[in-house]
Amino acid sequence: EYENFGSKNYSSATFRIVNIWRPTGKLQLRTSIWQEVNPSLNPLATIRRERVFRFLPNWRVSAKQSFEILFEFQNDVLRDNPFTDGNDDVLDEDLITTYLQWNYQPSEHITIQSRVQKSKRQSDGVFRNFDSNLVFLNLQVRW
């Protein structure tokens, strides 16, 4: 299985488009699309392709408070042979993530973040499908 391991090509390529639009001073809309091809993340597959679409509006309520809403769609494909039409896929999975985050910075050195996140994965791999809900509170103190 690993006899040709040393002769594999471990180069990677990333194609990324990011657009940031600020219709007002308090509202920012960030859209990004990227595709990454990286065979080195899984030594058993010849190639790994990741496609991501992310939409992240940010609303700055005041100098100390802001809200973020994220929608992200990610598609990962591990493929045995990159020169075929895609019938050799080892793994094909979709991950959809959304979150609402509140940021508060009462001083220059303290940041408080609170996030509610939902993720859903559909996969034909070992881990199959899952749904996750996450709520967290983060406190950062910087000197």
Residue ranges with predicted function:
Residues 1-143:
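Gram-negative and organellar
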